[in-house]
Every structure is written in structure tokens, then in C-alpha cells.
């Protein structure tokens, strides 16, 4: 149950009732009450919730916002749940609640257990999250790694929030890059077999391609040497793509990312999907021919220039395939499509939304998360290249260096739109300075407390014992109340992080919860001689374990019981 949302609804109803009462009494002159926000103030002294409704309606009421706020506050029925309601600043209304609303949270967490934090906000709506979609011509780099952590955590959040989620990897296995890949493979293949051939100028210079061709020769010898060049390239690409994709899949699984669908760009060409998309665009009036090429009328939809879809040589552009791919996504019946792209694709977002509109779908159902760059630091200096390979640092190397959990946490710690400075030394440090260590240590400490309690013969109150009258009101220390409040926040936090596509909120929540638990443990002795207080605190400790575990699992991290 989302206790925070329930309280929001209760406060909202009280505000609406107060406004309607003031309007009926001719104290204020306002029309229909618009939707208004109820937020949690940053400063505790500003109460538990705050609203700006008076500021929203002041102009219509022809009153100063503070004056309108005071009219509202005067008519709010405080009942036995509202401790205080005050006007603050330019016209905010701050609400402070009695602690009683928090206590039902504790047994609810026990009852829900692994499902605590889940909600039905998504109502089963179908969502596709496409992320990473790295070129299968090389290894996964830091941008891919950040996208993997963000995308997978977002997918987990959406599932928790009640959406039907599909994770998809788009395989870029067609177009110019594959032609260059084929030429590169052929050159390395021939060179390894003793032929003196030049390497293509725009080829892929990675050592991994040499290793791929060396592996092929070890398995199959020079059987492709006698083939005509185009056929040889086709066979080499087929072998290399299979190997590269297997390697990418293994690396991502090692990183905790498992996809539901791997979608091939080449399949769009082979199935006629691109041609069908062009026909749809033509029927909708968004295609014209110029100098032998087919163009998309992007300017008719507000873009600065039109885009080529089919070159004069008859070969479709990448954009044509991308439009066909997005049409395919919506053809499959998704209610919401989310792409995670690198920030260098920012110019492509509006083009793609307009293309979605041009093929007959609602562009508002497509969201694109743009992800900023990652910089690795070691010893206070930027790490640009791998010492082992002389190339960019790969995700495999990062996992070896800092571990999956630290890598995933660090990548999700900042919003996608923020540049990320990844400190390798910090990620390995076993101290409170390292955020992932700090959070996981909190979970391990909780497990240690529960083991100690069990060894002393004390059990966490369960089911009937709680329902039969465990007095939770003894939990009245500020550190206890702050911890319970944070626990109560989780379902609301998950729902917001999912619907607003902000997986970094989970990292922040985990850190806040860990800090509040450490504070509680410092100020409140758990295994006290007072049975009633001890039982209540053991329940709070176990709830903290459940919540921290659920958040760590949502982020794709382990919840260690010992450290």
C-alpha cells in the first residue's frame, strides 16, 4: 500500500473541501479548482507536506496568495490526524501530521515483504525500453555501460510500478558500418594468412577484430581464401557478428542485464518493413522525390530541413530503417516506448518524434532519455585508455576492476542528463565515502543485528503477534520516526521514479535510508531490556532490511548479509 499517496489524497480532499466552503460562503471568488501539487518539503521545519494551491489560484481569486492561503487554512478540518497547518513564505501551505499515520506502515512492510514498494500505477500498460543497442562491431564501452545500468534499473522500476515491460536490444547489423566491418575483417583475415593487403582507411582498427579472425582461422583454416571477395566478406561478417553478439550478451548478463528481445536491423530490410514504411509515409503525404532520391518532408512537421530516406543508388538510409523500426514498435502494440540514447543523438529526437507522427502514431507515446558522457578517474587523473589493450576501457574490464555492484550503483547515482565522473578508486574503497559500500554495509549491519537478537533468543514479531496489539507508539524517538517515514516513502518513490523515468532516485533513496538507519542505530538501543520497546525496534530493524534489500535488487545489486 502507498501510505504517502493515501495521505496526499486525504490532504487534497481537505484542501478542496476548505476551498469549496470558502467559495460557498462568498469568502473567495474562484471557479473549478485546478490540479495542484503536494510535495514533501526539503526542510523538516516546513512540515510533512506542502502545497502551492493558493499561489495557483490567487490571480483568479484576485487576492494576495498568502491571504488566500489563510482563508483555506482557516477552513481545514484538522481532525485527529493533522497536527498543524500553517501558511509559509509567499503563500505555501505546510501540513504537519500526527505520528499515528506512520505506524501501520510497519506491519504492512512485513506482509508485503519482497513486493513492498510495488504499485499498480502502470495498470498493466505495455512499455518497451530499448537501451544499449551498441554496434556489434566492437566491445561495450562506458557509454554502453551507463545505458545498461540506467535502462535495466528503469525497466525494473516500471515493472514494480505495475507496467508490463519489455527490454529490447536493437542490433545495428546493416548499413555502411557493416560494410566497413566486412572490409576490416577481410583485410585482417588475409593478412593473418600471409597476404600483403592494405587496411581500409575507414576500417575498425581494434585488436579484438584480429583476435576474431585468428579464432576463425584456428577453427576453419583458409577455407574462405578461394572465395570471391563479396561472398568471403559475407561469410566473415556472419561469423564475426555471431561471435561479437555472443560476447556482448555474455558481458551484459555478467552485468545483470538480460533482454527479452534482440531485434535485428537487417530483418527490417529482409522482411520488407522499410518498403512498407515508405509506402505509409507516401500515403500520408510525407515523401517526395528529388534528383533520384526519396526525401522525408521533415520541414512540414517543423524541422529545419528534409531528410533523405532512400539514396539515388536505391539504398535506404539509416534514418529510413530507424523510422521502420519505430513503426514496428508501435505496430507491436506498445502503449509507451522509451529509448535511451547518447547525448550526441539530441538532434535526432525531434526528427524521430515527427517521423512517428508521420507514420500515424502519437509521438507523445515516445520518450527519449539522453545520456551524458562518462569520465573515468584513477589516482585523480582521467583514464582514457586501457593499459592492457591500448584502446578504450571496456565494460568487462570495469567489472573486473570494481565489480558489478559498484559499477551499476555509480552509473545510476546521477541523473542521465548529468555528466558522470566515475572514480575507480572510490568505487573500490571499503569505507563510508563509497556510496555503494555504505548502502550495502547498512544491510549487512541490519542482518548482523537480527542474528545477534536471534542468538539472544529474541525474534522479530510476526503476524498475529503484531496484530494482537504490539504497541508501536513506543517508537517516538526522532530517529525512529524519520526512519519509518523514509520506509513509508518507498512505494511513492518507486511510482515517481518509474513514471518520471528517473532511476537515479533509487540510488538517492538507498543512501538516505542507509543514513537514517545508521542514525537510528546510533541513538536507539535495539536489544533493550524493555520487551515492548525491543519488539517494536526489532520490527523496525527487519522492515529496514526488507526495504533496503528491495531497493538494492531493483537496482540490480546484491544485498549482502555479511561484509
Curated annotation (Swiss-Prot):
Keywords per UniProt: Aminoacyl-tRNA synthetase, ATP-binding, Cytoplasm, Ligase, Nucleotide-binding, Protein biosynthesis
GO cellular component, one term: cytoplasm
GO molecular function: arginine-tRNA ligase activity; ATP binding
InterPro entries: aa-tRNA-synth_I_CS, Arg-tRNA-ligase, Arg-tRNA-synth_N, Arg-tRNA-synth_N_sf, ArgRS_core, DALR_anticod-bd, Rossmann-like_a/b/a_fold, tRNAsynth_Ia_anticodon-bd
GO biological process, one term: arginyl-tRNA aminoacylation
Domain of life: Bacteria
Subcellular location: Cytoplasm
Reaction catalysed by this enzyme: tRNA(Arg) + L-arginine + ATP = L-arginyl-tRNA(Arg) + AMP + diphosphate
Motif 'HIGH' region, chain ranges: 134-144
EC number: 6.1.1.19
Signal sequence, renumbered to the chain: none
Subunit structure: Monomer.
Family listed: Belongs to the class-I aminoacyl-tRNA synthetase family.
Name of protein: Arginine--tRNA ligase
Organism: Heliobacterium modesticaldum (strain ATCC 51547 / Ice1)
The organism's taxonomic lineage, starting at the top: Bacteria, Bacillati, Bacillota, Clostridia, Eubacteriales
Amino acid at each position: 500500500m502507498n501510505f504517502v499517496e493515501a495521505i496526499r489524497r486525504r490532504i487534497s480532499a481537505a484542501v478542496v473541501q476548505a476551498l469549496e466552503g470558502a467559495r460557498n460562503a462568498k469568502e473567495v471568488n474562484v471557479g473549478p479548482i485546478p490540479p495542484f501539487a503536494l510535495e514533501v518539503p526539503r526542510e523538516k521545519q516546513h512540515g510533512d507536506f506542502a502545497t502551492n494551491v493558493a499561489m495557483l489560484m490567487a490571480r483568479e481569486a484576485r487576492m494576495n496568495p498568502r491571504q488566500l492561503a489563510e482563508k483555506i487554512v482557516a477552513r481545514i478540518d484538522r481532525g485527529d490526524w493533522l497536527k498543524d497547518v500553517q501558511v509559509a513564505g509567499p503563500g505555501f501551505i505546510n501540513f504537519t501530521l500526527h505520528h499515528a499515520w506512520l505506524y501501520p506502515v510497519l506491519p504492512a512492510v512485513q506482509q508485503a515483504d519482497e513486493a513492498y514498494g510495488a504499485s499498480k500505477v502502470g495498470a498493466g500498460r505495455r512499455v518497451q525500453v530499448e537501451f544499449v543497442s551498441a554496434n556489434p562491431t566492437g566491445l561495450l564501452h562506458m557509454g554502453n555501460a551507463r545505458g545498461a545500468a540506467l535502462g535495466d534499473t528503469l525497466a525494473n522500476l516500471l515493472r514494480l510500478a505495475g507496467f508490463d515491460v519489455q527490454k529490447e536490444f536493437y542490433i545495428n547489423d546493416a548499413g555502411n558500418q557493416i560494410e566497413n566491418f566486412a572490409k576490416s575483417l577481410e583485410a585482417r583475415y588475409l593478412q593473418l594468412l600471409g597476404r600483403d593487403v592494405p587496411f581500409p582507411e575507414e576500417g575498425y582498427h581494434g585488436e579484438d577484430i584480429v583476435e576474431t579472425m585468428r579464432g576463425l582461422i584456428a577453427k576453419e583454416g583458409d577455407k574462405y581464401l578461394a572465395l570471391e571477395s563479396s561472398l568471403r566478406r559475407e561469410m566473415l561478417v556472419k561469423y564475426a557478428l555471431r561471435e561479437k553478439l555472443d560476447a556482448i550478451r555474455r558481458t551484459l548478463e555478467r552485468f545483470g542485464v538480460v533482454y527479452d528481445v534482440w531485434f535485428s536491423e537487417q530483418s527490417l530490410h529482409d522482411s520488407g518493413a522499410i518498403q512498407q514504411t515508405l509506402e505509409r509515409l507516401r500515403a500520408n503525404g510525407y515523401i517526395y522525390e528529388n534528383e533520384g532520391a526519396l526525401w522525408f518532408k521533415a520541414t512540414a512537421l517543423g524541422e529545419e530541413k528534409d531528410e533523405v530516406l532512400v539514396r539515388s543508388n536505391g539504398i535506404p538510409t539509416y534514418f529510413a530503417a530507424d523510422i521502420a523500426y519505430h513503426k514496428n514498435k508501435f505496430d507491436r502494440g506498445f502503449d509507451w516506448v522509451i529509448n535511451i540514447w547518447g547525448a550526441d543523438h539530441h538532434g535526432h529526437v525531434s526528427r524521430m518524434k515527427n517521423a512517428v507522427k508521420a507514420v500515424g502514431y502519437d509521438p507523445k507515446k515516445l520518450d527519449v532519455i539522453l545520456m551524458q558522457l562518462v569520465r573515468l578517474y584513477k589516482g585523480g587523473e582521467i583514464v582514457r585508455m586501457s593499459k592492457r589493450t591500448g584502446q578504450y576501457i571496456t565494460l568487462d574490464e570495469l567489472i573486473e576492476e570494481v565489480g558489478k555492484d559498484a559499477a551499476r550503483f555509480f552509473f545510476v547515482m546521477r541523473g542521465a542528463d548529468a555528466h558522470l565522473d566515475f572514480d575507480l578508486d572510490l568505487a573500490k574503497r571499503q569505507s563510508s565515502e563509497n556510496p555503494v559500500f555504505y548502502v550495502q554495509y547498512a544491510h549487512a549491519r541490519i542482518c548482523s543485528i537480527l542474528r545477534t537478537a536471534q542468538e539472544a533468543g529474541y525474534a522479530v514479531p510476526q503476524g498475529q503477534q503484531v496484530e494482537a496489539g504490539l504497541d508501536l507508539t513506543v517508537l517516538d524517538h526522532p530517529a525512529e520516526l524519520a526512519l519509518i517515514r523514509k520506509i513509508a516513502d518507498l512505494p511513492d518513490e518507486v511510482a515517481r521514479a518509474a513514471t518520471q523515468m528517473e532511476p537515479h532516485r533509487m540510488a538517492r533513496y538507498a543512501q538516505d535510508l542507509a543514513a537514517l538507519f545508521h542514525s537510528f542505530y546510533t541513538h536507539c538501543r535495539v536489544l533493550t531490556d524493555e520487551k515492548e520497546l525491543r519488539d517494536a525496534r526489532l520490527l523496525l530493524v527487519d522492515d529496514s532490511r526488507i526495504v533496503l534489500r528491495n531497493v538494492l535488487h531493483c537496482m540490480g545489486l546484491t544485498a549482502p548479509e555479511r561484509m
